A protein has these predicted regions:
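Active-site loop immediately N-terminal to the catalytic Tyr-X3-Lys motif
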Residues: 83, 131-135
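Conserved glycine-rich cofactor-binding loop
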Residues: 15
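Conserved NAD(P)H cofactor-binding loop of Rossmann-fold oxidoreductase domains
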Residues: 73-78
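Residue(s) in the substrate-gating loop at a strand-loop-helix junction
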Residues: 124
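Active-site helix of classical SDR
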Residues: 105, 140
């Protein structure tokens, strides 16, 4: 088991519908949590920027003197037929959902190695199944999810634990904040607080992944 009390964790996307409850659950278990995102609140870090991960490291070391864990809960979505989707929108999703998390991991892993910490990414159920009218979004999430097993093996040599979490549709409000298109009707999703608890349980247990079928 991983001790979470007193550890310094940066949650990227901490103001989001899933990032906020994850941050709250970590705090409830005694972690020192810093929120990172395009507007902070504690660290300004935009995953579209290759320097975002370095900003996370600087922010954590500058305020707490250490970094023990990073949770990436950031993400953007768009809806619509692929043929009708603006290429700029596709690029935006891959920057935020796939390239950005890779750049983030690249920057934070050396510092996490010093504390034998962890890096956790939230990819989601769409990494397991592609849906019509969400093709670029599904592809971007599948890309980062597919990278995690290989990264886990690389990070193990550094003493860093890497995890990939793929919760089913959750009531985060993300569909209502799409950067393009209109969301189709979705069935009722999971409770974000329950999903956050399952994710933090998995972090504490050093689980390498939690597939969509493993969320209650």
């Amino acid at each position: 088991m991983r001790e979470l009390t007193g550890v310094v964790v940066v949650v990227v996307g901490a103001s989001g519908g899933l990032g906020a409850p994850i941050a709250a659950e970590l705090r409830r278990r005694g972690s020192i949590v810093l929120g990172a995102g395009r507007s902070g609140p504690d660290i300004v870090a935009d995953l579209r920027d290759v320097d975002a991960g370095h900003a996370v490291v600087r922010g954590a070391l500058g305020t707490q003197g250490r970094l023990d864990g990073v949770v990436n809960a950031a993400g953007i979505v768009a809806f619509g037929d692929l043929v009708a989707t603006d290429p700029v929108v596709i690029e935006e999703m891959f920057l935020t959902n796939a390239l950005g998390p890779l750049w983030l991991a690249q920057a934070v892993l050396p510092t996490l190695a010093e504390s034998k910490g962890f890096f956790a990414n939230i990819s989601g159920v769409v990494a397991e199944q592609s849906l019509a009218n969400m093709v670029p979004y599904c592809a971007s999430k599948a890309a980062i999810s597919h990278a995690m097993p290989g990264l886990r093996r690389e990070a193990r040599r550094l003493g860093v634990h890497v995890a990939d979490f793929r919760p089913p549709h959750t009531e985060t409000g993300l569909a209502g904040r799409a950067i393009a298109g209109t969301a189709p009707p979705f069935p009722q999703g999971l409770d974000p607080d329950a999903v956050a608890r399952r994710i933090v349980d998995a972090i504490a247990a050093n689980e390498p992944e939690v597939a969509s079928s493993a969320f209650d």
